[in-house]
């Protein structure tokens, strides 16, 4: 049985085993050879090993220390007190019986060192450094990995402190046995090791109820203090600021940005009583230690004295529990609750009085469970004698301000300077500065001599990470488990349960118990997120990738809202193509207790059924027909008609499905919904950004227009421009783009709940570049008047002719003559597009081509007919490879002509195919989907992209063929999600067929938009990969069947002699991305 996790490479396993067997430290550099940093950290931590971030750029891995810190301290003191080497050797010999000679793990060979020798090395190191000068100690600290391990570091510093206080004088009598107990490493049946046995009694001391609520029992004894990633600059040491470069501010003042709209700083002289500050300083000074990762903001010489009080999000740290109170806060709650609580509440009041807009926004977005002492602050950084170099605070809520207050000290200088504003603020004890911590800031020089000054300050803020999906899901899991455990003994499984009932911080979230058992953790977290926003009188955006159950979340929210508030009306706006889906979902979950007094799905205000429903609705309020709750699900096209028919309609809650349509600059729907004056707004979308960043700005502003006050349009546009520059290939814009990404993401995070990953089988997404046949290329150049390889960018986005031509020359002629125009195309074409074509008559050449095509079909020469189109040739080969495995495929096309042409061609090949068109009624669509799902002989479905890309469950197929590309890549993502969603048990393969025209124009636009989406939503710094850097993937393909298919496609010959396919590209390779969180 392997000793290490599957995520670790074999080389990493060997390295860790070597350290365990020999006790020799290993210096490693994260990368593909060993594994990424998080894998190395997780593996080493899981087995009790110690990790140190030296040398620069690398990590030193050390074996576990099998001795408690208190025992190690006592042993070091005893060792230091002995006079001779003989006495010291005798001391170590007494450890023989109490030290285990081998760890309890399965090793490749026996242990090759005695653990006593490892302890001897540590003890001697500490003893040697007891009398060392600070300079000597620092030199040792820079090169000795053991000094970076918390127990060893603490022991050394404690002994040095006692030596300077004159406490290390007692000698240990010779022959006295040392009573030292060593901790054994516990090995579990699953192969994992727990080097930290739980000490529940110690962990429970002085923990407030709120703290207990924030910490799982299993983590009570695990202290991650010092591993918080707090605004760490990477790379070179940060610069220090000099006061000569700044204008000094000594009196109350407000500093605005150059536009005069955005607050940069508010300085309040003597804002807090000095006695209150000093009392608080005495209680929180202990938070500030050198156990941190902020050396670069302290001149790069040594770690400063700093620490975290309150709640923190350990998102980048090797701990299973990511969001919780810090160790110091839990252990000292009873001590700090008085003076510190009073101080923070006074700061909270000052914040409210001096920056009401920022305060109100921060108060509304902070999760109640993270309100430290019932303030708008979740987290406090405590700094002691810390002159910070230039940095930006990366995790603070961008819609609010950070509060800085000096609590105690005796110093001169050390002004807080804002670099861009050229202002420095003179803060003394009791002074308060509220400022935008995203701006570059730092302290100027201290006038006092080295070591002769003292300054204790706090920085209070709201951590955005506490509102992240990780924290929401983590807490939801604990709450759900507790609820499920409590309800196991309930009398009735049909009862309603309050998901937020186990905490007093959140509004009631009452739903049927059967539904609660069904919801995923993501859905639980989304429900809590929405309920909190609605309670605050705001709206929110649920940006969940396709297949995560947005509809069920929405219905559950509607149920809870009605349950809590009594009779009311709720409006759900959904595209016409999704109305049937809403009806089916409502019917499906009715059996689970999700029952609504009135549920009306409206597609046409002229229908007789609507009149009957409306009559019942209007007759409410009488003695015989009391008021009840109604949920209306309405097609956007009928909103105006509905409102004119139902006078005075005022919904208490509005839900907009596929709500990215709201973000359109000229959205008529937004205007109509605004007229309803409903602030409780929920937008459902898997694609909050489709074309540009401004869509996101408008979307967030629609759910709560107050957020624009903290990030004006001008500032957002500057951020957007920085991101766009980098996305489009300007590497010099990287730093600006990264900052802009972080700022925008943190600014919107309180209002946008984002989950873009789903636990499904793999998705393999390919772009297949198809050639034109000789006939296609000639027609392209003559009829569309553009050379097939040049000047393609001049074509309008609404140009449809190239798409029909890429299907087949005969399809192109049919489009020109109007054969396919009877039902219009299935996209929103620009007005006048078809009028530009006029009445087209076939030329002699056209007529001859049509007759030749007919002749090929009549004579059974299907291969020659297909060879007139690169896409059609590729399609037939792809389908044959799919059907050989008895698997199913869905073909998406946006054009009626292409859909019909594909279906007819497949029928000629005796392939059983069914179709769904835009003109089909809902009943026929449902029958076709059921036939495709249940009939094993039906292997192919041809469907309109605009119809089939939304709401349908096509998981019977695991192959998706995108026949024609379009400028918005999110439409294609929606199409793929019809098959790649919950209930899919197989790997899904997507084939995007692209002609030379699409490769040169549409695919480039798609890559840019995908990169932008990743930047803004996926927390990735992304950039478009130039076309000349995209290599063919055929030789790199790991799957034998697919590699054979790619080779086959390249050998297929078109009319004119060209190969059908020129290149196979992975879609993921068109954008290069790097995670930044």
UniProtKB/Swiss-Prot annotation:
Gene null: resulting phenotype: The genome contains reduced level of DNA base J in the DNA. Cells lacking both JBP1 and JBP2 show a complete absence of base J.
Residues the entry annotates as binding ATP: 544-551
Motif (DEAH box): 657-660
Keyword Nucleotide-binding: yes
EC number: 3.6.4.12, 1.14.11.6
Protein's cellular compartments: Nucleus
Cofactor needs: Fe(2+)
Pfam families with a match to the protein in the record: Helicase_C (PF00271), SNF2-rel_dom (PF00176), Tet_JBP (PF12851)
Catalyses which reaction(s): ATP + H2O = ADP + phosphate + H(+); thymine + 2-oxoglutarate + O2 = 5-hydroxymethyluracil + succinate + CO2
Binding-site residues, 2-oxoglutarate: 455
Gene3D superfamilies, alphabetized: 3.60.130.30, P-loop containing nucleotide triphosphate hydrolases (3.40.50.300), Tandem AAA-ATPase domain (3.40.50.10810)
Record GO cellular component, one term: nucleus
Entries under PROSITE patterns matching the protein: HELICASE_ATP_BIND_1, HELICASE_CTER
Cofactor binding summary note: Binds 1 Fe(2+) ion per subunit.
UniProt keywords, alphabetically: ATP-binding, Dioxygenase, DNA-binding, Helicase, Hydrolase, Iron, Metal-binding, Nucleotide-binding, Nucleus, Oxidoreductase
Single GO BP term: reciprocal meiotic recombination
Region annotated Thymine dioxygenase, chain positions: 1-516
Function: Dioxygenase that catalyzes the first step of DNA base J (beta-d-glucosyl-HOMedU) biosynthesis by converting thymine to 5-hydroxymethyluracil (HOMedU). DNA base J is a hypermodified thymidine residue found in the genome of kinetoplastid parasites, which is localized primarily to repetitive DNA, namely the telomeres, and is implicated in the regulation of antigenic variation. Probably also acts as a DNA helicase. Recognizes and binds specific regions of the genome, hydrolyzes ATP and allows the DNA base J de novo synthesis.
Protein's recorded name: Bifunctional helicase and thymine dioxygenase JBP2
């Amino acid at each position: 049985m392997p000793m290490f996790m599957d995520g670790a490479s074999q080389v990493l396993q060997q390295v860790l085993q070597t350290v365990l067997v020999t006790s020799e430290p290993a210096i490693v550099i994260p990368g593909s050879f060993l594994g990424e940093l998080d894998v190395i950290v997780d593996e080493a931590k899981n087995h009790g090993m110690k990790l140190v971030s030296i040398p620069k750029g690398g990590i030193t891995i050390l074996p576990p220390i099998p001795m408690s810190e208190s025992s190690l301290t006592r042993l070091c003191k005893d060792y230091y007190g002995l006079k001779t080497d003989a006495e010291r050797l005798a001391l170590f010999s007494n450890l023989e019986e109490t030290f285990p000679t081998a760890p309890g793990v399965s090793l490749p060979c026996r242990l090759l060192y005695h653990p006593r020798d490892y302890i001897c090395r540590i003890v001697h190191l500490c003893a040697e450094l007891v009398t060392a000068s600070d300079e000597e100690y620092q030199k040792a600290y820079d090169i000795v990995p053991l000094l970076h391990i918390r127990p060893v570091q603490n022991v050394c510093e404690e002994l040095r402190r006692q030596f300077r206080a004159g406490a290390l004088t007692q000698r240990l009598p010779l022959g006295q046995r040392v009573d030292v107990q060593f901790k054994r490493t516990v090995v579990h049946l699953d192969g994992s090791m727990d080097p930290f046995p739980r000490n529940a009694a110690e962990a429970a001391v002085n923990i407030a109820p709120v703290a207990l609520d924030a910490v799982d029992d299993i983590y009570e004894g695990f202290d991650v203090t010092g591993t918080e990633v707090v605004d760490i600059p990477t790379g070179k040491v940060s610069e220090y600021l000099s006061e000569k470069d700044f204008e000094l501010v000594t009196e109350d003042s407000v500093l605005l940005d150059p536009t005069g709209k955005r607050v940069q700083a508010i300085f309040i002289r003597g804002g807090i009583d000095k006695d209150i500050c000093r009392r608080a300083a005495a209680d929180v000074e202990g938070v500030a230690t050198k156990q941190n990762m902020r050396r670069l903001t302290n001149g790069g010489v040594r770690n400063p004295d700093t620490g975290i009080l309150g709640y923190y999000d350990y998102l980048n740290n090797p701990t299973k529990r990511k969001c919780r109170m810090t160790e110091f806060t839990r252990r000292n709650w009873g001590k700090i609750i008085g003076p510190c609580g009073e101080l923070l509440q006074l700061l909270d009041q000052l914040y409210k009085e001096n920056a009401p807009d920022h305060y109100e926004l921060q108060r509304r977005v902070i999760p109640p469970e993270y309100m430290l002492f019932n303030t708008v602050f979740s987290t406090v950084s405590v700094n002691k004698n810390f002159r910070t170099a230039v940095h930006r605070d990366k995790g603070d809520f961008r819609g609010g301000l950070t509060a800085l207050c000096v609590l105690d000290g005796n110093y001169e200088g050390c002004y807080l300077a804002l670099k861009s504003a050229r202002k420095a603020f003179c803060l003394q004890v009791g002074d308060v500065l509220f400022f935008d911590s995203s701006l570059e800031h730092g302290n100027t020089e201290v006038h006092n001599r080295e070591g002769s000054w003292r300054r204790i300050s706090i920085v209070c803020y709201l951590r955005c990470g506490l509102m992240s999906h990780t924290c929401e899901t983590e807490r939801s899991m604990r709450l759900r488990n507790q609820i499920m455990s409590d309800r196991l003994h309930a009398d009735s499984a049909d009862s309603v349960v309050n998901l937020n009932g186990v905490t007093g911080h959140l509004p009631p979230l009452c739903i049927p118990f059967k539904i609660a058992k069904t919801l995923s953790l993501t859905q639980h977290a989304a429900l809590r997120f929405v309920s909190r926003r609605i309670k605050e009188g705001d709206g929110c955006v649920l940006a969940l990738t396709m297949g995560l159950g947005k509809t069920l979340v929405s219905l559950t929210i509607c149920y809870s809202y009605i349950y809590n508030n009594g009779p009311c009306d709720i409006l759900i706006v959904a595209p016409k193509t999704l109305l049937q889906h809403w009806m089916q979902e409502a019917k499906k979950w009715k059996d689970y207790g999700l029952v609504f007094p009135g549920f009306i799905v409206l597609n046409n205000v002229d229908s007789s059924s609507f009149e009957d429903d409306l009559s019942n609705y209007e007759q409410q309020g009488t003695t015989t027909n009391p008021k009840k709750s109604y949920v209306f699900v309405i097609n956007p096209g009928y909103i105006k008609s509905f409102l004119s028919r139902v006078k005075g309609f005022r919904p208490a809650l509005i839900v907009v499905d596929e709500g990215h349509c709201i973000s359109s600059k000229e959205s008529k729907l937004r205007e109509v919904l605004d007229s309803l004056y409903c602030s409780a707004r929920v937008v459902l979308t898997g694609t909050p950004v489709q074309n540009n960043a401004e869509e996101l700005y408008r979307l967030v502003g629609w759910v709560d227009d107050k957020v624009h006050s903290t990030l004006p349009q001008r500032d957002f546009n500057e951020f957007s421009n920085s991101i766009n520059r980098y996305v489009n290939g300007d590497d010099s814009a990287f730093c600006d783009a990264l900052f802009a990404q972080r700022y925008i993401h943190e600014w919107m995070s309180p209002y946008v709940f984002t989950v873009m990953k789903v636990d499904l089988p793999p998705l393999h997404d390919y772009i297949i570049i198809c050639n034109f046949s000789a006939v296609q290329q000639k027609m392209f150049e003559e009829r569309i008047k553009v050379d097939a390889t040049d000047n393609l960018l001049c074509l309008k986005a609404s140009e449809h002719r190239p798409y029909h031509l890429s299907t087949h020359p005969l399809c192109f002629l049919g489009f020109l003559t109007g054969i396919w125009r009877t039902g219009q195309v299935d996209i929103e074409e620009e007005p006048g597009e078809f009028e530009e074509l006029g009445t087209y008559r076939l030329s002699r050449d056209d007529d001859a081509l049509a007759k030749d095509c007919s002749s090929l079909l009549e004579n059974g020469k299907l291969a020659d007919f297909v060879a007139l189109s690169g896409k059609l040739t590729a399609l037939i080969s792809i389908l044959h490879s799919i059907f050989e495995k008895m698997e199913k495929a869905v073909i998406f096309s946006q054009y009626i002509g292409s859909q019909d042409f594909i279906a007819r061609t497949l029928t000629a090949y005796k392939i059983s195919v069914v179709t769904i068109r835009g003109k089909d009624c809902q009943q026929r669509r449902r029958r076709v989907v059921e036939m495709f799902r249940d009939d094993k002989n039906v292997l192919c479905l041809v469907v309109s992209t605009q119809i089939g890309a939304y709401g349908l469950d096509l998981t019977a197929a695991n192959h998706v063929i995108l026949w024609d590309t379009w400028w918005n890549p999110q439409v294609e993502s929606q199409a793929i999600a019809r098959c790649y969603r919950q209930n899919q048990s197989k790997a899904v393969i997507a084939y995007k067929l692209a002609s030379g025209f699409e490769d040169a124009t549409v695919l480039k636009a798609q890559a840019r938009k995908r990169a932008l989406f990743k930047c803004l939503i996926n927390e990735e710094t992304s950039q478009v990969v130039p076309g000349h850097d995209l290599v063919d993937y055929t030789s790199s393909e790991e799957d034998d069947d697919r590699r054979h298919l790619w080779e086959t496609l390249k050998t297929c010959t078109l009319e004119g002699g060209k190969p059908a396919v020129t290149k196979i590209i992975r879609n993921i390779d068109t954008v290069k991305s790097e995670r930044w969180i």
